[in-house]
Amino acid sequence: MPITKATPLFLRYRLKGFVFLTLLLVQGVFTACAPAVPVNNKSVSAVQPEDKQALKPDPALGEYTSDLKFNTNFIPKKDDPFRPFYDLSFTLQFQDPYTATYGTGWLIDWKDNNQPNKFTAYIATNLHVADNLRNVNDYEFFNQFDYFDDPTESFTLGKFVDGNEIKQIVPDAMHEPSLVRIETSKLPKTAYTTTLFINDLGEYRLPAADFAVLESI
């Protein structure tokens, strides 16, 4: 029987109550017939499949494993063709009062300062990495950043090294390979920048073709 404006008020409430009880009864029947599903933190809609043995990278292998879908960190051996790239590559960290920005650089030249344990290193990197440097003492041509920007407080070089080599210098250090960081004695300066050193990549790729050299002591 449809509910209309002509239906008496008391009958409307009886019909609506009947519909509500019917829906509640149907829900109870379906709930009682449904299979029990264990509840966990991930989902209550289905039984979770058994976890497979997690694949863990093994740095000792020093090679790409297709099952892992990524390259693990390892140190190339002396006769590895990638060893020269490893020897010259470093992580770069620019630290301002609030944030730390990271990049990668490689040593392309150096200059003897005629001072014990000091030399000037010329580190190549991408311009968008070097752009994080805010050194008020930078060379005049490159010292044109907004002075409202947070200045760089420290510059750090890092390298993934063999734990046994570290232990020769620091006896209490761990044997495991680890990332070692060393802060330079002074903030670097910008020695060179360009975005035109590659001209045949096509217009859509030129924004990524940037290059810079940092002078660090």
Swiss-Prot record:
Its main location: membrane. Residues 1-32 form the signal peptide. It comes from the Bacteria. It is found in: Cell membrane. Keywords: Cell membrane, Lipoprotein, Membrane, Palmitate, Signal. A lipid is attached at C33 (S-diacylglycerol cysteine). It is a lipid-anchor. InterPro entries: Mycoplasma_peptidase_DUF31, Peptidase_S1_PA, Uncharacterised_MG067. The keyword Signal applies. A lipid is attached at C33 (N-palmitoyl cysteine). One of its GO terms (cellular component) is plasma membrane. Pfam families: Mycop_pep_DUF31 (PF01732). Belongs to the MG067/MG068/MG395 family. This is Uncharacterized lipoprotein MPN_590. It comes from Mycoplasma pneumoniae (strain ATCC 29342 / M129 / Subtype 1) (Mycoplasmoides pneumoniae).
